Curated annotation (Swiss-Prot):
This protein's record includes keyword ATP-binding: yes
Gene3D superfamilies, per database record: 1.10.20.140, P-loop containing nucleotide triphosphate hydrolases
HAMAP family linked: IPP_trans
Gene Ontology terms, MF aspect: ATP binding; tRNA dimethylallyltransferase activity
Protein name: tRNA dimethylallyltransferase
Cofactor(s) needed: Mg(2+)
GO BP, sorted A to Z: tRNA modification
Length: 296
């Protein structure tokens, strides 16, 4: 539990899987310490998806200042680098006001960028990305990992099974620059100074977390998630856009096209939400072992 006496110069980083209660925890903390909240969820960045991404309501934003929520049009992309720039600016402004800052979300790469920095890796030519991707497709993950291992052994060991995108990127960076992605990252300074922040991970029991995931989807439908998906579908946006990869979007869009019943869409969305929560749990367990664990 966070003690009020421990807030003087700290930035609070509150992470956790979807439906773990981290947003409510952050809001409660913000009210207790008169703090301001900064979004660290890659989907809550996008406008028009507040319900589907469980973004803060008007009532919640009235209780404490919120930053970087629903600020990007879904037709646009958004990178870790752009978030880091916006987040560090927001944190500086909050601290200039003499307020504690609370960064909350479920996107592990955002937190890693804050605490470890974001490597200034030179651009990788599209041709090399394609070559690395084709090599992965031709050889399969197991053999591709053996190819990557001498180039970047740390990345090969760190990247989870099935994460094709990160494996391919590590290979392409090493081939293009002659320097491993891990080396680029190691040479990078963190955005937050050591000792200036405190990390917390909300870690509810697995069965309880899954039950929360299931219950929240039904509430989202009641609160207008289908209307949000319908509004974006009418825009004819590219399905590859990051915003349209929000958990539940694909399943509800299929229902709106008449391809599935609402019950089928909900069942599929529940399964995808559980898988997403499991991936998040694994990431935070592996990448933030020293952060304090909170059972909500």
């Amino acid at each position: 539990m966070v003690e009020s006496s421990d807030i003087a110069s700290r930035i609070w980083l509150i992470a956790g899987p979807t439906a773990s209660g981290k947003s409510a925890y952050a809001l409660d903390l913000a009210e207790r310490i008169d703090g301001e909240i900064v979004n660290a969820d890659s989907m809550q960045i996008y406008a028009g998806l507040r319900v589907l991404t469980a973004g803060p309501s008007q009532e919640e934003t009235a209780r404490a200042p919120h930053h970087l929520f629903q600020i990007v049009d879904p037709a646009l992309g958004w990178s870790v680098g752009r978030w880091l720039e916006a987040a560090t600016q927001a944190l500086a402004e909050i601290q200039a006001r003499g307020k504690p800052a609370i960064v909350v979300g479920g996107t592990g790469l955002y937190f890693r960028a804050l605490t470890h920095g974001l490597a200034d890796v030179p651009p990788v030519p599209e041709t090399q990305r394609e070559i690395s991707s084709l090599l992965y497709a031709a050889r399969g993950e197991t053999e591709f990992r053996e190819i990557l291992k001498p180039l970047d052994p740390e990345a090969e060991a760190r990247i989870e099974s099935g994460d094709r995108q990160r494996l391919v990127r590590a290979h392409a960076v090493a081939i293009t620059t002659g320097k491993s992605l891990t080396a680029w990252q190691t040479d990078t300074k963190p955005a937050l100074a050591p000792g200036s922040w405190k990390g917390l991970v909300l870690d509810p029991p697995r069965a309880e977390l899954y039950a929360r995931c299931d219950a929240r989807l039904a509430v989202m439908v009641e609160q207008g998630a289908l209307d949000e998906v319908r509004a974006l579908e009418t825009r004819g946006l590219d399905p590859a856009l990051p915003a349209l990869k929000a958990v539940g979007y694909r399943e509800f869009a299929a229902h709106l096209r008449g391809e599935t019943s609402l019950d089928q869409a909900l069942d599929a969305a529940r399964q995808e939400t559980r898988r997403y929560a499991k991936r998040q749990l694994t990431w935070f367990r592996n990448q933030t072992p020293d952060w304090e664990r909170i059972v909500p």
